[in-house]
Amino acid sequence: MPQFLDSRQPDFETAFTALLGAKREDSPDVDAVVAGIIADVRARGDAAVIELTERFDRVALTPQSLRFSTEEIAQAVDEVPAPERAALELAAARIRAYHERQMPQDADWTDDTGARLGWRWSAVSAAGLYVPGGLASYPSSVLMNAIPAKVAGVGRLAIAVPTPDGQVNPLVLLAAQISGVDEVYRIGGAQAIAALAYGTDTIAPVDKITGPGNAFVAAAKRRVFGKVGIDMIAGPSEILVIADRDNDPDWIALDLLSQAEHDESAQSILITDDAAFGRAVAEAVDKRLETLERRAIAGVSWRDFGAVITVSDLDEAAALSNRIAPEHLELCVSDPEALAARTIHAGAIFLGQYTPEAIGDYVGGPNHVLPTARSARFSSGLSVMDFLKRTTMSRMTPEALRAIGPAAAQLARSESLEAHGLSVQARLDRLNG
């Protein structure tokens, strides 16, 4: 049974604080193992990757077979039924159109001293995407990671997808093809992250690594950060639904279960201003759990981390939402835009009764790679910006240097950086001499 909280009860603040602080992820301490794997890949390259892949995925590879060939991808893609292909192509088109609008503009201007200033944006040269493997892997994650990279202008995009016992989801390869992925490698785990970061004879290194993974992948991403950029270290999925009584309890129950079925550590929370409606939703969840295919997972998540919170009004709901800073926030209320204006911390907001979070997972257009564990307080979901870097530009004319150079020389002397100051002063002396 989930927790039932009421903001009007005297112990509410204590209970709510405990809900916020609940540890939902039992991460094993794998750092030492991961450090060893990374060191091995750095030292032995392909040989280490091949050996580790055979040990963990039970697949015997050679340097030549690490990468899927064009023919292998084409053969797998041909197996995808037309309806699934059409759905992927629709999703890809919408994701691409949305992310194209995110592209920032370069800037270039001349200020009142005559100095020319500005910035330009450029993509990283190469990016690597990790895709959890097997037949249960998620092609939508390929689209959500790969398309922004390609829209940003990344020249080379490589994917690492483990193939346990030689199994791969053809939809993953189709998603890679649709997204414009350049290379697909049949490797996984910390060894894949190490290979992407440091390179081997077969796998050229990348500049940025994105994509979800298990504890070993997360630990590897932490360790290679600095050598390469990473997107984020994502935790278990979460959803917060703010709903009034003018909703179908079954719809809201399904929205809550849409995240609960991801992981036993996922969290689904309902905030409502109607206690009876909250109870009706909880009953609808229980009813759906009787038949849901992933009821074993969803049931544990709902029991251990689910919550129904009753508040006095929607202003209070917005305030609590900002404290939760959820990954996904659904606003199933009569005026969702007004409520959205008061909710400033959320990975993604879904407005109105006809915008279930699952639309955002697949075909809405915005990215589904989102900050978890309250990190929406300070971070954003994946976008083209994750694959871009801004370079500042400046050009001084003689007049501009005369105008601002003396201040630079003075500040350099104040910081006891003699050569800094002299590099400016030497030019000023010639201009003024």
Curated annotation (Swiss-Prot):
Top-level enzyme category: oxidoreductase
Coiled-coil segments on the chain, per record: none
Family annotation (Pfam families): Histidinol_dh (PF00815)
Residues annotated to bind NAD(+): Y130, Q191, N214
Name this protein carries in UniProt: Histidinol dehydrogenase
Gene3D superfamilies given in the database record: 1.20.5.1300, Nitrogenase molybdenum iron protein domain
Organism phylogeny: Bacteria, Pseudomonadati, Pseudomonadota, Alphaproteobacteria, Rhodobacterales
Function per UniProt: Catalyzes the sequential NAD-dependent oxidations of L-histidinol to L-histidinaldehyde and then to L-histidine.
Superkingdom to which the source organism belongs: Bacteria
Catalytic residues in the record: E327 (proton acceptor), H328 (proton acceptor)
Catalytic reaction equation(s): L-histidinol + 2 NAD(+) + H2O = L-histidine + 2 NADH + 3 H(+)
Keywords: Amino-acid biosynthesis, Histidine biosynthesis, Metal-binding, NAD, Oxidoreductase, Plasmid, Zinc
List of residues binding Zn(2+): Q259, H262, D361, H420
Organism: Ruegeria pomeroyi (strain ATCC 700808 / DSM 15171 / DSS-3) (Silicibacter pomeroyi)
Entry GO MF terms: histidinol dehydrogenase activity; NAD binding; zinc ion binding
Gene (name only): hisD
Matches recorded under InterPro entries: Ald_DH/histidinol_DH, Histidinol_DH_CS, Histidinol_DH_monofunct, Hstdl_DH
Family: Belongs to the histidinol dehydrogenase family.
Annotated binding of substrate, by residue: S237, Q259, H262, H328, D361, E415, H420
Pathway: Amino-acid biosynthesis; L-histidine biosynthesis; L-histidine from 5-phospho-alpha-D-ribose 1-diphosphate: step 9/9
Cofactor or coenzyme needed: Zn(2+)
